[in-house]
Amino acid sequence: MQTLKPIVLPQHFNYIAAFLSFACMLRCSYCINHHGGDLVKKRWMSGDDWIRGLNRLQARDIPITLQGGEPTVHKHFYSIVQGIRPDIDIDLLTNLELDPDEFMQKIPAGRIKRDSPYASIRVSYHKDQQDPFKLLKRVKYLKDHGYSLGIWVVDHPDYLAHTREVQQMALDMGIDFRLKEFLGPHKGQNYGTMRYPDAVNAKQVRSCDCRTTELLIDPAGDIFRCHADLYANRFSLGNILDEEPPTNLGEWMPCQVYGKCNSCDIKVKNNRFQQFGHSSVEIRNISAPYAGNQEYVKEVVNTYGKQDAVVGVKSA
């Protein structure tokens, strides 16, 4: 098998995301992966290919964050975690709809744990899709066995009171429970603290120069500079299995779709050191509008709508 050259990340990079899958067993009406399109139909790499690709990364102190969709639905999830070089830190974003005993059997507590101001396993709770009592019990069970877990919840404007009830339950159990800003248009209002407010869901499109601080890898191994490109499947920088590493990681690059940016890239948030004021991308040289944005929406139309969760089903 051909040896792949190392991928060396720029010094200013802050985050590595490995989207093992865009699929999920939950059916949240506000899920960003289902704002139209066929994301979940994206080809999945095998576990061996993920291991081969991720192990070429020269990540320094940046953990590889396994996420999705729901990363644990990948049929090779456990072998991927076990196969990543031990000197590379791993974080995990998950809804934790899994067998905790199987998880503990296959992943030692110390493998997804590092010295950081937040949990390495960040669990999401989704109202109407999960039983909060069962989820909190599962989190507590793993914490009591030495795993680094916390709960992160999208602070949906329709569920504010319920979210705080669950938050108090978690805090009473000694579980770290944090709120994440709800992002995007909802009932005629755009939500989220944005560094470039007119970059998201704008009525007009502009050109600009953009520089990212993140390495985003989709389920097929394609590398993207931002979530907007990732979800739209456009402007790939290459593939994690390409013999030659991408030559333009973290460089200033022209972009013709300012106005179609994704909130995850533009929002003001904490960096990996929990210092507030960071955003995933920097933007400069914004032009005057040159076209209307055909993707502008007053309200997100989600392809799921409101459906019951499909828990316990593993994707192929």
Which functions belong to the PLM regions below?
Residues Q2-N14, H34, D229-A316:
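Flexible mid-to-C-terminal extensions adjoining Fe-S/redox cofactors in radical SAM and related proteins
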Residues L4-I32, I62-L66, T213-I217, G221:
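N-terminal pre-triad scaffold of radical SAM enzymes
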Residues Y15, H35-M45, R60-H74, R85-F103, ...:
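Core AdoMet radical
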Residues A17, S21-C24, N201-K203, N248, ...:
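Residue-level signal for mature regions of secreted extracellular proteins and peptides
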Residues A17-F19, Y30-D38, R43-N55:
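Short, surface-exposed loop/strand segments
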Residues C24, C28-C31, C208, G221, ...:
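Short cysteine clusters
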Residues L54, Y78-V81, M104-I107, L135-K140, ...:
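Generic structural signal for well-ordered alpha-helices
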Residues S120-N239:
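Radical SAM enzyme [4Fe-4S]-AdoMet core and its adjacent flexible, acidic
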